[in-house]
Amino acid sequence: MTPDTRPPRHTATLSSCRAATLAAAALLGLTLSPGAATAQAPAKAAAGSAEERVPIPIKLPKPMFEGTPENLAVPNLMKPLGRPRDPFLAPAGVTNVAKDKPVVSSDMEPVIGEIEQVTDGDKKGADGSYVELGPALQHVTIDLGAPHEVFAVLFWHFHKTPRVYLDVVVRLADDAAFTKNVRTIFDNDHDDTSGLGAGKDKNYVETAEGKLVDAKGARARYVRLYSNGNSANELNHYVEVEVYGRPAK
């Protein structure tokens, strides 16, 4: 009598179940390890996917004033957050690439201080820690030395007393003359007094936290900041500007 070569009934049943399980897992985007009956999550995406984000290493200066500032009578004014700003997340390895980088200004003969103080790392805000530019619309421009991926621009105008700087505009560009690939990443000049275009961002009160602007990883070599006086007087001030980024690939 010829032996029965058909697989035992229980083996055929297990094979059918395993095939069904594999099919279901495939529909869910899961994989099954060979010979295993448990599903495994897909492996992490390969290079080119979204990078892991970590808090950028910001060191804040000591606050120069405390309490809630009095009504500054400035339109379109942002309400105080009332708590510390949330950490800003960027890819690991992002640093302040503006430290000690060259700076030029629309006013190269400041009333107080030197233009180089804009990137010297001193952000305390006390006397001797800031540069004072003349009245009307003025700007400072930082040369990062090469194209960078810019994730955030953080700056302090003057935080010794509460005040609001007017027509604040932050731009990125590929050239020093700001004629190539110019992008505006912040603009609170709501009535286009500066002639740079009306912006939708709000005015804000200067504090020791500075103003942090999300640049979203934009590629640029030059960073320019404008202002047009402040709520206390017609002069323009900069304590420090930091640019958080990394060399462009």
Descriptions of predicted regions:
Residues D4-A23:
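Bacterial N-terminal signal peptides that target proteins for export
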Residues P42-G67, S106-M108, V131-H139, P147-H148, ...:
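Trp- and acidic/polar-enriched beta-sheet ligand-binding modules for extracellular glycan
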Residues S33-A43:
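Signal peptide processing junction and immediate N-terminal pro/mature segment
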